[in-house]
Amino acid sequence: MLEGAKLIGAGAATIALAGAAVGIGNVFSSLIHSVARNPSLAKQLFGYAILGFALTEAIALFALMMAFLILFVF
């Protein structure tokens, strides 16, 4: 019973990974649209896009860490 609850909890914790994937897609989609409109700002916008990617990916890594904690620690 407890093992099944752990698996369900870990699966629920990984739902955030799908949201992070959508967020990363939005970051780079916005980058492509912005560079297409104003190519002279490409270098500056790329820095902002990498920052957005890193922050979004951090949320995904925290969610994955929670899933592993649920599976192997509790």
Swiss-Prot record:
GO cellular component: mitochondrial membrane; mitochondrion; proton-transporting ATP synthase complex; proton-transporting two-sector ATPase complex, proton-transporting domain
Subcellular location: Mitochondrion membrane
UniProt site (Reversibly protonated during proton transport): E57
Membrane topology of this protein: Multi-pass membrane protein
GO biological process: proton motive force-driven ATP synthesis
Regions crossing the membrane: 8-28, 53-73
UniProt KW keywords: ATP-binding, CF(0), Hydrogen ion transport, Ion transport, Lipid-binding, Membrane, Mitochondrion, Nucleotide-binding, Transmembrane, Transmembrane helix, Transport
Any one GO molecular-function label of the UniProt entry: lipid binding
Cited CDD domains: ATP-synt_Fo_c_ATP5G3
Keyword Ion transport set for record: yes
Alphabetical list of PROSITE patterns matching this protein: ATPASE_C
Oligomeric and partner information: F-type ATPases have 2 components, CF(1) - the catalytic core - and CF(0) - the membrane proton channel. CF(1) has five subunits: alpha(3), beta(3), gamma(1), delta(1), epsilon(1). CF(0) has three main subunits: a, b and c.
Entries under HAMAP family matching the protein: ATP_synth_c_bact
Functional description taken from the UniProt entry: This protein is one of the chains of the nonenzymatic membrane component (F0) of mitochondrial ATPase.
Similarity comment: family membership: Belongs to the ATPase C chain family.
UniProt cross-references to PANTHER family, sorted A to Z: ATP SYNTHASE LIPID-BINDING PROTEIN, MITOCHONDRIAL (PTHR10031), ATPASE PROTEIN 9 (PTHR10031:SF0)
Protein name, per record: ATP synthase subunit 9, mitochondrial
Organism: Oryza sativa subsp. indica
Organism lineage: Eukaryota, Viridiplantae, Streptophyta, Embryophyta, Tracheophyta
Name of encoding gene: ATP9
